[in-house]
């Protein structure tokens, strides 16, 4: 991971003075943090916990959960909120990365693993085969470990929309055939803010991906996540939750966006803990089977807990 100091369109915006008092991450034990971080270095792996500076990584490590970042550490997309390095990655994915991830899972005795990836628009399959390969590698050495996937939209490679949709579904099928316990794809924000926040992705394309997952394998629950604090309104948040339910999305996470650096899109609002409780009740009322909502909630937070 690299932290850039170069000026961006956001650099001139004055940062917030201080995080609100309710933004207090659980650090976990220093020994547990060090153990995971050392193993990640030893096996030359990337984790979104570290790359994305997740505020919950100490708590997750302590509970036997970790999120591995596949396909390298450079993303072909340039989302305005994300800490992961942007650019054009090396053409080939490291074929031994799957084995190294499996070794790390075994050594750490992880109970629940989330596999995510940088966007790899440069590859024909957008990294779908690598997801499948890694799931199978983990199952060989840690058969009782549950594996969730958090994927990009697998979109691209064809101008014709009908053909592009067919290709996207074929990539999705590769991942779902490996039978993850949950398929996660994040909307991130409300429809109005998509273009600014998620460059290269679209709101309805993501909804269609979640819908397609349920159509391909309805035994695998689907999940999506939202960040608050980017300028969205309450009614837009509720509409987004309704849109997710309209494609039979069963799980949702709702958390506060925290600006990684001055190079990233600024926080417009820090929502109160009671607001997150409010949206949780609404989501549950809409029929979501599992809702995690709170200022520090992220996509993988308490992912190991079963849905109701």
UniProtKB/Swiss-Prot annotation:
The protein depicted here goes by the name Lipoyl synthase 2
**Keyword Nucleotide-binding assigned:** no
Q: Per its UniProt record, what SUPFAM superfamilies does this chain match?
A: Radical SAM enzymes
Q: What is its main location?
A: cytoplasm
The compartments listed are: Cytoplasm
What species is this protein from?
Prochlorococcus marinus (strain SARG / CCMP1375 / SS120)
Note accompanying the cofactor annotation: Binds 2 [4Fe-4S] clusters per subunit. One cluster is coordinated with 3 cysteines and an exchangeable S-adenosyl-L-methionine.
Do you know which Gene3D superfamilies this protein is assigned to?
Aldolase class I (3.20.20.70)
**What would be the name of the gene that encodes this protein?**
lipA2
Keyword RNA-binding (UniProt): no
**Reactions catalysed according to its record:** [[Fe-S] cluster scaffold protein carrying a second [4Fe-4S](2+) cluster] + N(6)-octanoyl-L-lysyl-[protein] + 2 oxidized [2Fe-2S]-[ferredoxin] + 2 S-adenosyl-L-methionine + 4 H(+) = [[Fe-S] cluster scaffold protein] + N(6)-[(R)-dihydrolipoyl]-L-lysyl-[protein] + 4 Fe(3+) + 2 hydrogen sulfide + 2 5'-deoxyadenosine + 2 L-methionine + 2 reduced [2Fe-2S]-[ferredoxin]
